[in-house]
């Protein structure tokens, strides 16, 4: 799932990539479901989610150029950029974290 909510229609202009209201709605639902499960399953089970930003997978050049211009780190993520935070959330290092959505988007959602 990409970012917190993909609502920048300009990114998808002149590409064959979609930007559906259904995607944005499902991401919001997933974030709320994370909080619900964390509340329902605590204290024995921790529940967290991630919101990765755009992961580069040979998207159209126009999309990539627009995306990186709005990303504080100036690049799209690779799968490797997502792995570390996921391992952290699955480890005991995050034993006091639950009900959270970790945004891993290189600062895209802050612009």
Task: Name each model-derived stretch.
Residues 34-35, 83-86, 90:
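Short-chain dehydrogenase/reductase
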Residues 10, 16, 86-87, 98-111:
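Short C-terminal tail/terminal secondary-structure segment
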Residues 37, 75, 92-93, 110:
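Conserved functional loop/turn residues at catalytic and ligand-binding sites
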Residues 46-56, 90, 103-105:
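Conserved SDR Rossmann-fold cofactor-binding beta-strand/turn motif
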Residues 1-42, 54-55:
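Catalytic loop of short-chain dehydrogenase/reductase
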Residues 58-72, 76:
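A short C-terminal helix-loop "cap" of Rossmann-like NAD(P)-dependent dehydrogenase/epimerase domains
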Residues 71-82, 93:
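A conserved structural motif in NAD(P)-dependent oxidoreductases
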Residues 42-46, 97-99:
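Short, small/polar-rich loop/turn modules that mediate ligand/substrate recognition or access, typified
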